Amino acid sequence: MPLLLSSGRRLLSRMAASASYVAGTHSMAFVTAPSQEVAKKIASGLVKNKLAACVNIIPNVVSVYEWKEEICEDAEVIMMIKTRTSRLEELTKYVRENHPYDVCEVISSKIDQGNPPYLDWISEIVPEKK
């Protein structure tokens, strides 16, 4: 019976936590990089500095864009970064300081909803802005 009560309390606690998620508390940022090595270095720094909970590095992206009046096409990787919305400014600053491009892509979108335990985990890993 104590085990059942303990499990029930944990379930209720998780349900309460998930019901309290405020849409937009977390964001997903997207950053392209010229190689997997560059992306891994940036990703490791973001996680180490508690600016991101997780960074997925997706290979084999082709970017087509205009630069200095020319159409360019480059093979890149893209990072999908999960963080707190309140930390986006610091995250962008870190990427700009550690990225080889003159103008690096850092764009983001707020997370409206998701798997409650995962969203809770992001909150645990990435502290609120000080």
Briefly describe each language-model feature range.
Residues M1-K130:
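Positively charged, small/polar-rich N-terminal and surface patches that mediate targeting and assembly
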